[in-house]
Amino acid sequence: MSMYPGWTGDDSYWAGAGTTASSQSASSGTSASASSSAAAAAAANNLKTYELYNHTYMNNMKHMLAAGWMDNSSNPFAYNPLQATSANFGETRTSMPAISQPVFPWMKMGGAKGGESKRTRQTYSRSQTLELEKEFHYHKYLTRKRRQEISETLHLTERQVKIWFQNRRMKHKKEAKGEGGSNESDEESNQDEQNEQHSS
């Protein structure tokens, strides 16, 4: 089976290139008028060969699209040879029938569960970050009631506030460790574990 399902296998393109070279070498010994007519015939032959090659190429591209090997719908800026050369044949991409392509399980996004999509990273606005940092400056740990208040004020979920504080405490711990406060960070990690058990 061929790699390209619609490939016709005709060698007319390569045969046309050979006849052009032989017609040019034969015309080199004749008069100027014969040479110009031979050149015109060679040019016409080259044009026919090009059109045949282009037509065959376009058919192969259509078959590849039909087989689902090429799909530019995910990238609208990708080069599409059908759009680039279809002006020669009076065709457009929209005139082709819509082809439904099969979606195999390995093509789907993999998550922990079948229908679960990967969670995106939460970005906080400057005002949200400022308020969270301000609260962290005064209180490294939040009570459930305070976490609810902050989440309502900043339009975040309680889970987002909780995770932000966990991450901020880890950052604070790393910063303290970098300054040489290893004893403080050990005490803080024990306190982190105790407070997490009480606040959850």
Curated annotation (Swiss-Prot):
Effect of deleting the gene: Defective QL neuroblast daughter cell migration. Lin-39 and mab-5 double mutants have reduced sex myoblast specific expression of sem-2 in the developing mesoderm.
Tissue: Expressed asymmetrically in the QL neuroblast.
Keywords: Developmental protein, DNA-binding, Homeobox, Nucleus, Repressor, Transcription, Transcription regulation
Keyword Thylakoid attributed: no
Residue ranges for the DNA-binding region feature of this UniProt entry: 115-175
Extent of Acidic residues compositional bias: 184-194
Annotated Gene Ontology cellular component terms: nucleoplasm; nucleus; RNA polymerase II transcription regulator complex
Highest rank taxon of the organism: Eukaryota
Stretches for region Disordered: 164-200
Pfam families recorded: Homeodomain (PF00046)
GO biological process, one term: neuroblast migration
Cellular location(s): Nucleus
Motif Antp-type hexapeptide mapped to chain: 103-108
Listed GO MF terms: DNA-binding transcription factor activity, RNA polymerase II-specific; RNA polymerase II cis-regulatory region sequence-specific DNA binding
Chain's role: Transcription factor that binds to the promoter region of the transcription factor lin-39 to repress its expression in Q neuroblasts and thereby direct left Q neuroblast (QL) daughter cell migration. During postembryonic development, required for posterior-specific pattern formation. Within the posterior body region, controls epidermal, neuronal, and mesodermal cell differentiation.
Family note: Belongs to the Antp homeobox family.
Identification of the protein by name: Homeobox protein mab-5
